[in-house]
Every structure is written in C-alpha cells, then in structure tokens.
Amino acid sequence: MKNLQLESSDRVSKFAIVLVVLSLVSSAYSAGANATEVKSPPNILFIAVDDLNDWVGVLGGHPQAVTPNMDKLAERGLLFTNAHCTAPGCNASRTSLLMGLRPSTTGIYQNAHDWRMTSLVESAVHLPQHFKNQGYKTLGAGKLFHAHTFFDPKYLSGFSDAKAWDAYFPSLTQQMPAEALPEKWPVNSSKDFYGGHFDWAPLPIKTSEMADAKVVAWAKKQLSKKHNKPLFLSVGIYRPHVPWYAPQKYFDRFPIESIQLPKHLSQDVADLPQAARQMTKNKWHQWIVANNQWKGAVQGYLASLSFADDMVGELLSALDDGPLASNTTIILWGDHGYHLGEKQHWEKFALWENTTRVPLIVVSPENTVPKTRCDTPVSLLDLYPTLVEVCDLKSPPQTLEGKSFLNLLKKSGSEQERVAITTQGKNNHAVRSRQHRYIRYADGSEELYDHKHDPHEWTNLATDNRYAKIKKHLASLIPTTNRDPLLPPKKSDTN
C-alpha cells in the first residue's frame, strides 16, 4: 500500500514539475511574443513646414505667435531648442536632409539645382526611397522635395521622385495641389521685388479651400486606416512660405494695430563684413519701411504660421484617433528659418541665427520622454542617420554625413562637443555651438557671436582678440570639401 502511495505521489510530483516547466515555457513564449510586438517597426509621420522660423510658441521667437498644436506636440516628446538647417534655402536644405549629404559635398546650394541631375547622388539613396527599400509603405503629400513658388508653372511638380512612393497626393508626378490666390496680386507689396510674389493678404475663402488643407485631408485618411506594412508618411505644409495668403480668420487673430515688430537694432549691419552686407542687398527692407508695411508683413507671417499650426493639429488629431497612434514616431521640422527685418534682411539665404535656427520636435514612444528639451546643437542633416537607428534599418549605400542623435532622444542629455554647420553658397559657412556662432565667408571675412550674452547677434566679436581661441577652434570644424555649384545660380533663384 505504501509503495502504491509513493508511486502515486511521485507521479503527482512529476506532473507538477511538468506543469511548472510548461508554464515557464509559455511565459517565456508570451514574453518573447510581447517583445516582438513592441519591437515591430515604428511608423513614421514626417511633417515638413516650409520657411518655419523660431516664431513657434515653445521657442519664444515672437511673443504673439499662436501655435498651440506645435506647442502640444513639443510637450509629448523632445524639443530641440538649438536645431539648425544645413542650408538656408528650400532646395539645398531639403536635398541635404533627404540625401544625408552636405551642400558642400553635392554642390547643391541653390533652388535651381535639381538633385536628380548630379552624378554625385546617382548612387545615393534618399530617405523615402531607403524606407521603401527596407519594406516600408511610403506615402507622401505636399512639398517634401523642393517645388517652385506657385506662381511658376513648374510649381506643381517640383523635384520629386515618383519611384520612391507607393502613393502621393495629388499624384506621383505632382507634389502640390493648385493654390488659392487673390484675383489681383500683389495686394500689399510691389512687383518691383520678387515679381510681386513677396506679398500678404487675407483671402475670403474657407480653410478647406487652401492647398495645404487638401494635402492634410488626404494625409488624415491615410492615418485613419491600417496598412499591411509599416508606414512612412511624409506631409509637406507650404505655409508660412510666401506669399502669406490665408483665410481672413487667421489675420483676424492678429489685429494690425497690436502687432509687435521683431527685436532689431537700427544699425545692426554696421559691424558686418562686406560679404555679409551683400545678403541684404535686395532693398526689401528699405521698401517695407518706406511704405509703412513692416507690421503688415509681420501680420501676414503670423497669420500664415497660425494656419500652418492648425494643419499640424489636424494631422495629430487624425493620428491620435486612428489605429497607428501607439507605434508612430512623429518628426516635425522646418526646412530653414526666416528674417522679418532683423539685420535689415527679409527672407532666408543668410547665415545668421534667424535664418538657420529651425523647430525640430521628435516624439518617439520607445525613445523620448514627454516635456523634455535639449539645447545641444543638432542639424537637420542628422535626421537621416537618426531614423535609420530608430527604425533599425540597414545603412544606405552612401556614407551619411550627419550624426545620429538617438542617444539624445533617449536621455535628452548633452555630448562633449557637437556643432551644427550651415552652408550658403560655395565656401560660406556658419558653425553653431552651444554658445557661439562663427561665420566665415569665401573671401575670409568673419563674424562671431556669443549667444549667452548676445542672443540677437547684435555685436560681431570676430575682431576681438579675446575670442581668438574660440574662433580658431570653430573655424577648424568648417568642411574642407567645397564642391563647385551644380549649376550657375539663376537671377530668379529666390523662391
């Protein structure tokens, strides 16, 4: 009887052991399955905003800016407060970001330089194409690659690459939908400069009639449904690029009598070298001041910016309400900054802070912490290698010249040294460190600013011997490769 009881007990013990083992195996399998689920490739929502300077609320560029949606996005993740473009012009900046190569490497400095025509980038794979090659579904809408001003017949197509996309709005061969324009233009400026394209005015139309609204409406549909592959969705918002036309309600948010001009110094160009003064030679500032249009232009920019922010809000709401929200990394970036009278300069195409500094916000569920800021200098050139790491992709065939900032996403800390370099034309460069901006032009002339004591860059310290060591160090970081321009710049190359 005892033997039978022992045998029965042994069987029970062995059975219990088997159950424990099976339970452990099941738990391990479940954990592995969960780990696999967590590590599934993230979707990417890639939002490009044209001519977006630091007048975003969270960056404090202008006290009257109304950008609640971009501000809320910054609270969801990491805001880079010291991010800069690689070139202060639409085409050169975007080509550099999308190719992962410096303008000084490609020779693409101007808006007229079609990246598709240079042999140097024939073997390079641009960012959307790389995502497609790595198994992503690539969708796009609006301006990602450069497109001409919408007064130009080439505006609708631009320099896009049809083979990189599974679908594009309005079409694979047309980046931009037709834009709403006043019956007669210019409304407030003059055809004497920029052919009248530099203009601003309210439009008596609904928001949904704007080209950007059509782009965003299409993108919202893509965010509302599931896809059979991880999704790379690029959305290009054209405002606040000139002309600053927007529905009336956006102008109403900024009554002209209450408009504040940007902080400026009347004689701010006095200590600039001749090469720098050449950047203000278009005389737009003189015309605007003489015709009492400075406040009107600022109102136009603020209105267009507010409209663009509403478009960003539409995208974020669609993402949050759709099936992709939990596994989507969001990147919002401006292609370059913009002057509105600072240093008597209007537009971009310069190497000062107002032109190079851009909003850059990253929200990555597995990598970023809400409500964090990072003042380490980063470049838009760094986005390509960062996304390769975030999505665990293979490297593209070209050697990317940017530096991944994935480590900054994870801890929003700092590195021993990191700088952002901006190039305007051949051999004109700016180096931005955490505290200083150093500019050297092709003729050897220089500028140096200390942002700790001079955030508006009103005092050029380049001739102050006390800063010689700092200047020498920053100069040593300037690119040594300075390729000739791909094509001669065109006189009309200002869009």
At which residue positions do the language-model features occur?
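Formylglycine-dependent sulfatase
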Residues: 34-441, 445-446, 455-480, 486-495
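Accessible peptide chain termini
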Residues: 1-2, 495
